[in-house]
Amino acid sequence: MRRMLYAQLPSRALVVVAQLGIADILAEGPADISTLAERTSTDAVALARLLRGLAVFGVFEEGAEQVYSLTPLGEALTSGHPASALPSATLVAGQFGAAWGDLLETVRTGQSPFERSRGVSLFTHMEQDEELRAVFDDSQGRGLALELDEILRAIDFSAYPTVVDVGGSDGTFLRRILSAHPDISGIVFDLPGSTSLQAERPTADPLEGRYSVATGDFFDSLPEGGDLYLLSHILHDWDDDRAVQILRTCRAAMSDDATLMVVDLIAANRGQRDERLHTAALMDLYMLSLFGGNGGQERTAAQVEVLLSKAGFRITRVDSLPSGMNVIRAVRAA
């Protein structure tokens, strides 16, 4: 129990390491504590204790004479890592971490901290805070990079000639799908402020001509003509009514032959304690802290099925992956 109570300390230590840029310094090569303290303007004794603690958790290697180096785990805190946790650390250091600290009031009121302090939801707040939105999108994209290999091994996307990535942000998922399957094409769809793919498209893009970018609101309408409509970590951001509305918008754009694919964590049923469900449990607490008691959430398989049924879908297949991620496929119900 005490280990759980004190678990926030390694988290805070990682945030400090991220704020000081220590992983990027060590990416240049091993360094002793005096060098690290000088380059980060910190106290050498305090910094050594911080790094020593994280070395026990496998983030750093501590060598002779307090020389530190990165482990493969620690490399995930470097800015250049494809699945870098730096954007997530930035969120925890700022408004998201503050929301965690306000969890008691969230549980008492059911309201999110953003509703209480600003009178708007998190997503409405991010429309007004471009810097926060950019860090959030970056964090989402880097986190997705951790899942893509597993998903692409498990799912044959070649069966879907045109993929519509709904709420696809910078197109990370779609680009990986297209790279793995050269005979298909796709559309990235998101709010105008969220879709940075058009602006960031590489000058010599090997996927040129195989995808397009469409903007709009997935509560209103979506591009028609897709064979697969992909919702990756979208439904868990919304309450039940809004989630059903997103699904109905997908259904309206889909033909009878099209497939809906929902990629999300699945929460534990009553009494389940499978270790694979720990990630979903942590993420649901995360969602509670940000969205309040009646907002975004991780759902059980039965709850997801209810949402799909309300929106006019019938589940055809569920793939439960080793990481705890689930890929749910559905079609329009008769």
UniProtKB/Swiss-Prot annotation:
Tell me its EC number(s), please: 2.1.1.-
Can you state which reaction this protein catalyses?
5-hydroxy-3-methyl-L-tyrosine + S-adenosyl-L-methionine = 5-hydroxy-3-methyl-O-methyl-L-tyrosine + S-adenosyl-L-homocysteine + H(+)
Q: Which InterPro entries match?
A: COMT-like, O_MeTrfase_dom, Plant_O-MeTrfase_dimerisation, SAM-dependent_MTases_sf, WH-like_DNA-bd_sf, WH_DNA-bd_sf
What pathway is it annotated to? Antibiotic biosynthesis
Task: Read off the PROSITE patterns from this record.
Answer: SAM_OMT_II
Read off the SUPFAM superfamilies from this record. Answer: S-adenosyl-L-methionine-dependent methyltransferases, Winged helix' DNA-binding domain
Please give one Gene Ontology molecular function term for this protein.
O-methyltransferase activity
Q: At the top level of its lineage, which domain of life is listed? A: Bacteria
Tell me the residue numbers annotated for binding S-adenosyl-L-methionine.
D190, G216, D217, F218
Active site residues per record? H236 (proton acceptor)
Per the UniProt entry, what are the Gene Ontology biological process annotations, in alphabetical order?
Answer: antibiotic biosynthetic process; methylation
Keywords assigned = Antibiotic biosynthesis, Methyltransferase, S-adenosyl-L-methionine, Transferase
Name the family the entry cites.
Answer: Belongs to the class I-like SAM-binding methyltransferase superfamily. Cation-independent O-methyltransferase family. COMT subfamily.
Job description of the protein:
O-methyltransferase that mediates the methylation of 3-hydroxy-5-methyl-L-tyrosine (3-OH-5-Me-Tyr) into 3-hydroxy-5-methyl-O-methyltyrosine (3-OH-5-Me-OMe-Tyr), a core structure of saframycin A, a potent antitumor antibiotic that belongs to the tetrahydroisoquinoline family.
Name by which UniProt lists this protein = O-methyltransferase SfmM3
In which organism is this protein found? Streptomyces lavendulae
